[in-house]
Regions:
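Short helices/loops that flank or line small-molecule/ion binding pockets
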Residues: 1-10, 55, 164-172, 189-202
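Loop/turn elements at helix/coil->beta-strand transitions in domains of secreted/extracellular proteins
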Residues: 13-17, 55-57, 65-67, 144-147, ...
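Structural recognition of the beta-strand scaffold that forms the well-ordered cores
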Residues: 20-21, 28-33, 59-63, 70-71, ...
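Extracytoplasmic/peripheral linker and loop segments enriched in polar/acidic and small residues
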Residues: 57-58, 62, 66, 70-73, ...
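Short helix-loop capping/hinge motifs at secondary-structure junctions, enriched
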Residues: 36-56
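Ligand-binding clamshell of periplasmic/extracellular solute-binding protein-like
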Residues: 1-2, 22-28, 203-219
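Extracellular/periplasmic solute-recognition and catalytic clefts
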Residues: 1-39, 73
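Append "and occasionally in soluble cytosolic enzymes with long acidic Gly/Pro-rich linkers
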Residues: 50-172
């Protein structure tokens, strides 16, 4: 791209004027759909059972390396996209000047961001949770690889290129024997054609920018049983999940989170 060309050429007239600008209050995440439907309107039982499993989700957390995908957003400094929190760095500080996300990082016992590798990744834990998930989910009738439906705008080459990079990230990180990403398309409206009918397995790069700088405004979007919780009502559909022995742990996790918020 022109930006990369300028960055790599110290003699370029614009090189010394490049300044990286990060969002001030917006935070984007991956949002799972816990009540996914097939295109015929029936529940996608294989996906819904898999994503309700804690070990399955943890294998993604510890194993999914998105650094190549981030380059589609920031080719010069892809690790500037790394954010392991609901809020973005710079939203709010304590009285002694400590960034709120630093407090969360310490509570999560995550290493400091280093700009070289994703700090949440742990290959040993990822493999441990992968094998645990395969064992538990196979017993529930889940078939592998679990298929993840990922929708992009039709006839959009940039979106297709990014989706192919994301697909490769899944292949390299989790293995084609475990999860495969299906690239599907919508015609004009992702909301009307995909999100509202609940056809997506997960949404990438969807998030929130609160009207006022309070972490609770971000956390509240994921609460359970609240029609005004944006993520819950519009992205992950946790309130639509039927309680049973396979989903109760997932629901209990959301209930506990809601009580904490």
């Amino acid at each position: 791209s022109n930006l990369t060309t300028i960055y790599n050429d110290e003699n370029n007239e614009f090189h010394d004027y490049l300044v990286e600008k990060l969002p001030t209050k917006y935070s984007w995440q991956i949002h799972f759909n816990f009540a996914k439907n097939n295109e015929d309107g029936t529940p996608d039982t294989n996906w819904n059972t898999a994503i309700a499993n804690e070990a399955f989700r943890k294998s993604w957390y510890y194993g999914l390396n998105l650094s190549e995908y981030w380059k589609r957003t920031n080719a010069i400094d892809p690790f500037a996209c790394e954010n392991n929190f609901y809020t973005m760095k710079g939203l709010v500080y304590t009285s002694d000047g400590t960034d709120y996300t630093e407090l969360v990082r310490q509570e999560l016992e995550l290493p400091e961001l280093n700009g070289e590798q994703i700090v949440r990744l742990d290959a040993e834990k990822a493999e441990q949770y992968k094998q645990q998930a395969i064992e538990e989910l196979t017993a529930l009738g889940v078939t592998f690889p679990v298929e993840m439906d990922y929708y992009i705008a039709a006839a959009n080459q940039v979106s297709l290129d990014s989706a192919n990079v994301l697909k490769q990230c899944f292949s390299d990180s989790l293995g084609d024997d475990y999860v495969t990403l299906n690239i599907l398309t919508y015609v004009s409206s992702s909301t009307q054609e995909v999100i509202t009918p609940r056809l997506h397995s997960a949404l990438f790069g969807y998030g929130w920018g609160a009207d006022y700088g309070d972490p609770q405004n971000y956390l509240g979007q994921e609460t359970y049983g609240n029609d005004n919780a944006y993520f819950s009502a519009s992205y992950n559909y946790i309130n639509e999940v039927e309680a049973n022995e396979n989903t109760q742990n997932l629901i209990d996790t959301f209930v506990t989170f809601t009580e904490m918020v």
